[in-house]
Amino acid sequence: FLLCFFLVADVSYGINKDCLLPMDVGRCRARHPRYYYNSSSKRCEMFNYGGCRGNANNFITKKECEKVCGVRSRDSPKEN
């Protein structure tokens, strides 16, 4: 039990809780390009939002997703 707790805590520490929600296209049938934080790949990825419902892991731009979810862009210099 403790090992599982620490593994989950390590992955999610410091990340906005909304960013840990699963991608949710919503119930409507529109196709609005949006971005969500994929906690498996640790990147913001595009998806087609249906236009209603869904959840808070839904960003209009990739830049907004990266800012809110703390994702470093590939162009950022790495810390030593």
From Swiss-Prot:
Q: Which UniProt keywords apply?
A: Disulfide bond, Ion channel impairing toxin, Nematocyst, Potassium channel impairing toxin, Protease inhibitor, Secreted, Serine protease inhibitor, Signal, Toxin, Voltage-gated potassium channel impairing toxin
Q: Which residues does the UniProt record annotate as the domain BPTI/Kunitz inhibitor?
A: 19-69
* Keyword 4Fe-4S set for record: no
Instruction: Report the InterPro entries cross-referenced here.
Output: Kunitz_BPTI (IPR002223), Kunitz_BPTI_sf (IPR036880), Prtase_inh_Kunz-CS (IPR020901), TFPI/VKTCI-like (IPR050098)
Which Gene Ontology terms cover its molecular function? potassium channel regulator activity; serine-type endopeptidase inhibitor activity; toxin activity
**Localization:** Secreted; Nematocyst
Q: Could you tell me which Pfam families the record lists for this protein?
A: Kunitz_BPTI
- Propeptide residues, per UniProt? 74-80
* Gene Ontology CC annotations of this record: extracellular space; nematocyst
Q: Which domain of life is it from?
A: Eukaryota
Q: Which residues form the signal peptide?
A: 1-14
Q: Per the record, where is site Reactive bond? A: 29-30
Which cysteines link up through disulfide bonds?
19-69, 28-52, 44-65
PROSITE patterns the record matches: BPTI_KUNITZ_1, BPTI_KUNITZ_2
Q: Report the function annotation for this chain.
A: Serine protease inhibitor that inhibits both tissue and plasma kallikreins. Has hemolytic activity. Inhibits voltage-gated potassium channels (Kv).
Sequence similarity: Belongs to the venom Kunitz-type family. Sea anemone type 2 potassium channel toxin subfamily.
Name used for this protein in its record = U-actitoxin-Avd3s
What organism does this protein naturally occur in? Anemonia viridis (Snakelocks anemone)
